[in-house]
UniProtKB/Swiss-Prot annotation:
GO terms for biological process: dGTP catabolic process. HAMAP family: dGTPase_type2. One of its GO terms (molecular function) is dGTPase activity. It comes from Shewanella baltica (strain OS195). Residues 1-27 are annotated as: Disordered. The keyword Signal does not apply. Belongs to the dGTPase family. Type 2 subfamily. This is Deoxyguanosinetriphosphate triphosphohydrolase-like protein. InterPro entries: dGTPase, dGTPase-like, dNTPase_2, HD/PDEase_dom, HD_domain, PHydrolase_assoc_dom.
Length: 449
C-alpha cells in the first residue's frame, strides 16, 4: 500500500553495521532516543515550570507518555481496521514521531518561543515545530550535514504544519516596542509552519507525491477558523496519517496528564471541575461519557493516589478507544488519504479538558510570570549574541555563523538554533553570566552544543 520510497533517506544508509537487522524505523527511533536534543528535554518546561515541584512533568516525560499513548492508538486501530494493517506497519515509526515531536521547542515553553519569534521577525520567524523539523533533518550531529538522516516517512510524519513560513505569514500592524519588557505574546504569535531556510528538505520529503496531492497538502485554509480569531496568520489544513496519530496522542497527554499534575499540586480543584467540565460532559451524546463522568470526577480529586491514577487511566483509555480512521478520497497517496480522528463527542470532551488546563494552569499568573521571565532571558541572550557573534558565541557556533555569512544565508537562524537548543537552566545561568555583576566568571558555552 505504501511505496518503499518512503523508507529512503536523504543521505542514503551509510551506517550499516555488523549483524544489524533492525528495520529502518527502528533505526530512526534509536537515533532520536540517543540524541543530545532528546536528552535536553529533561530540563525544558512542559506546562509547570521546571523546579516548581518534584512531581511535575518535563518535556521528556511528556514525550515518553505521548509515545506510549501513540502506540496504544495504533494497536487499537490495527484491531478495528485490519484492512489498513499496511498503513500501521511499524510501532517504531510512531514511537519515533512521538518521542521527537517536542525536540525543537526552546527553553521556557511558549515564552521562549514567542521571544525567539520576535527576535527573528525580520529573518523568517521562529516556531517550535519548524525547529523540530530542522533539528531532525539538519542540525543534530548524527551526520555532517543531514541531521539524523531519518526516513522520508518519518520526516513526513513530523510535519504538523506542512507549508513554508512565507506561504502562511500575514503581516499585521504592530506598535514597535522600545523595550523587550513591553513584548506581548498575543501580538507576536509564531507562524505554524516550516522555515523557508529548510525549503530544500521540505521539497525532498514531498517528492513522491503527485503534483495535485502536493499542492493540496500544502495549501492553507481559506478564511479564519472561529477558534483561532486571535491568530492573524494562515493555517495549514492537512497532515499525514502518522502525524494525525502523533497529534492525538500529544493532545491526550496534554489534556489528561497535565491536568493530573495540576490536581496533585492543588491548582485545579473539584469545584472548578464541576463548574467547567461536568456540565458539558453530563449532556454528552455518548453513553460511556455520561456514565463514567461522576465516577471519574470523584476519583480525580480523591486523596487516595491509586484512585486518581485509575481515573487518569480510564480517561486515557476512553479517548484512545474512541479514535477512528477517516478518509479524504481527494488525495491519491494513502498516507494523506487516511487520518486518525476522534469521534465527535470525545473530541468535545478532550477540548473541554484542554480548556480547563489552559484556563486554570497556563493562564495562572504564577505560570505567566515564569513565561515572562523566560521571555526576557531569551531576548536578552539573542540581542547579546547578535551584537557581536564572533566575540560571544561558542567556537563551533561561530564557525556556523561565519559560513552562513560567507554563503549569503540567514545567519540569524544560527543564533536561533543555538538559543533554542538550550535548557531552561543553562539559558538562565548564561544570562546571569552575561548580565549579573555578581555572577561567576566561568562560562561553559560548549556544554550546550
Amino acid at each position: 500500500m505504501t511505496s518503499s520510497v518512503w523508507q529512503e533517506r536523504r543521505h542514503g544508509e551509510d551506517k550499516q553495521r555488523r549483524n544489524d537487522h533492525r528495520s529502518p524505523y527502528q533505526r530512526d527511533r534509536a537515533r532520536i532516543l540517543h540524541s543530545a536534543a532528546f536528552r535536553r528535554l529533561q530540563a525544558k518546561t512542559q506546562v509547570l515550570g521546571v523546579g516548581m515541584n518534584d512531581f511535575y512533568r518535563t518535556r521528556l516525560t511528556h514525550s515518553l507518555e505521548v509515545s506510549q499513548i501513540g502506540t496504544g492508538i495504533a494497536a487499537q486501530l490495527r484491531r478495528k481496521y485490519p484492512q489498513h494493517k499496511q498503513l500501521l506497519c511499524s510501532m517504531s515509526l510512531l514511537e519515533s514521531l512521538c518521542l521527537a515531536h517536542d525536540i525543537g521547542h526552546p527553553p521556557f515553553g511558549h515564552g521562549g518561543e514567542v521571544a525567539l519569534n520576535y527576535m527573528m521577525r525580520d529573518h523568517g520567524g521562529f516556531e517550535g515545530n519548524g525547529q523540530t523539523f530542522r533539528i531532525l533533518s539538519k542540525l543534530e550531529p548524527y551526520t555532517l550535514d543531514f541531521g539524523m538522516n531519518l526516513c522520508r516517512r518519518t520526516m513526513l510524519g513530523i510535519l504538523k504544519y506542512p507549508a513554508p513560513h512565507s506561504k502562511l505569514f500575514v503581516a499585521g500592524e504592530h506598535n514597535e516596542i522600545t523595550n523587550h519588557r513591553q513584548l506581548k505574546p498575543s501580538q507576536w504569535p509564531p507562524v505554524k509552519g516550516i522555515f523557508d531556510d529548510d525549503n530544500d528538505i521540505f521539497a525532498w520529503v514531498l517528492e513522491p507525491l503527485s503534483e495535485a496531492d502536493r499542492s493540496r497538502f500544502t495549501s492553507p485554509q481559506q478564511g479564519s477558523h472561529p477558534a483561532l480569531h486571535h491568530y492573524p496568520h494562515l493555517r495549514t489544513q492537512f497532515k499525514s496519517f502518522d502525524c494525525s496519530i502523533m497529534e492525538l496522542a500529544d493532545d491526550i497527554a496534554y489534556a489528561v496528564h497535565d491536568l493530573e499534575d495540576a490536581i496533585v499540586m492543588g491548582i485545579v480543584t473539584a469545584s472548578q471541575w464541576h463548574q467547567d467540565v461536568a456540565p458539558t460532559l453530563t449532556n454528552s451524546g455518548d453513553t460511556w461519557i455520561r456514565q463514567e463522568l461522576a465516577d471519574i470526577g470523584n476519583k480525580l480529586f480523591s486523596h487516595e493516589h491509586h484512585l486518581r491514577k485509575d481515573a487518569i487511566g480510564t480517561l486515557v483509555n476512553g479517548f484512545v478507544t474512541a479514535i477512528v480512521i477517516s478518509e479524504d478520497d481527494v488525495f491519491e497517496e494513502p498516507l494523506l488519504r487516511f487520518n486518525a480522528t476522534l469521534e465527535p463527542e470525545f473530541a468535545i470532551a478532550l477540548n473541554v479538558l484542554k480548556q480547563l488546563v489552559y484556563k486554570y494552569v497556563i493562564r495562572k499568573p504564577e505560570i505567566q510570570m515564569l513565561e515572562y521571565k523566560g521571555q526576557q532571558i531569551v531576548m536578552g541572550l539573542f540581542e547579546a549574541f547578535a551584537s557581536d557573534p564572533e566575540r560571544l558565541l561558542p567556537l563551533n557556533t561561530q564557525e556556523r555563523w561565519r559560513e552562513s555569512e560567507q554563503q549569503g544565508l540567514n545567519s540569524h537562524r544560527v543564533l536561533a538554533d543555538y538559543i533554542s537548543g538550550m535548557t531552561d537552566e543553562f539559558a538562565g545561568r548564561l544570562y546571569q553570566q552575561l548580565f549579573s555583576p555578581k555572577a561567576g566568571s566561568n562560562v561553559e558555552l560548549s556544554k550546550e552544543m
